[in-house]
Amino acid sequence: MAEGLFGPGFYPQPNEWTCGPFALKHALLALGRMVDVNQISSTARTHWWSGTNEIQLARAARAFECDLVLERRADAEQARKVLVKYLREQTPVLLCVDEWSHWITVLRAEDRRFVVVDSTDDPLLSVRTWPQLRNWWRYHDTDYVKDNPPVLYDLMAVAPRFRTTVKADFSVDRVKFLRRPENRRLAHHWNEYLEDLLEICKPPSVRIAEPLSMGEFLRRHQELLLTRVVYWHGDISRDEVGRVLRDMRFVSETYGLVIPASMSRRALADLAILISIWACSQRGVDGMFGSPGADARPEPKASRKRNGRR
């Protein structure tokens, strides 16, 4: 398997043959499971020449406690209805598009628009109309009939065997937000935000007496976090800290995570420690109490914009 595949977030595939593992990775991420694409590629036995077929993806899905449910329709409208049914249940769906040559993930249907994750795009998340998705999805079965072949629509729903306590809600508005250039870092490091937030927050539950959304929690405590982290670090700005807190709120609300009111003090301490560690990694820290300190990391160079698809 090729080198250069790495774990977190929404980022483009580095080659032409790993779209299948990336599509399954994005489906698992929507179900709250963070799996390295290398693990999926290894389990599926993805090959540089032939890529990954549906049998290999099904094997990988089973290894991560999911089943691929195959649905086939010959009528476009019937195919759309089946796709929408799964998406309304918040079950991510894999489609093989471009005449069965490329895997994508569909996460949501909203007013005949569909939220799609395509690992050859950058940014990966996009919104497609039904005619756009239909034309991309349909497959002419020339293996069956060469002249005037039948048109087929195949989908594979990623059905979890495990109890899903959190599921992502990638609405059209959320995808538009993530596609902004200034939010590229958030998209690329999505897993890191989610992993940390799952330690601080809880999935929504009727057993939580006083659940606080991250928005409400930050309304009460953000000013304290801003002032104390900025004061103690000394070389980080309020705007920079505020941006990280905004990103945390965005990820938290995408999965519907909450903070029990009884755990507010602990959550506040966790966030203060987490933001302080981030500030040190971003800007370094001077020596203190006899330690040598750490140098600030150099500012990353601006990347050139690329036109077209990878």
Each PLM stretch: what is its role?
Residues 47, 109-308:
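Noncatalytic regulatory segments and standalone regulatory/sensor domains
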Residues 1-6, 34-42, 58, 62, ...:
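N-terminal intrinsically disordered, low-complexity regulatory tails that precede a folded domain
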Residues 26-31, 63, 83, 109:
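Active-site catalytic microenvironments for nucleophilic, acid-base chemistry
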Residues 43, 69-125:
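Active-site-adjacent substructure of cysteine-protease-like catalytic cores
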Residues 6-50:
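A structured, charge-rich N-terminal accessory region that forms the first stable segment of a protein
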Residues 46, 50-79:
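Short, solvent-exposed, low-complexity loop/linker segments
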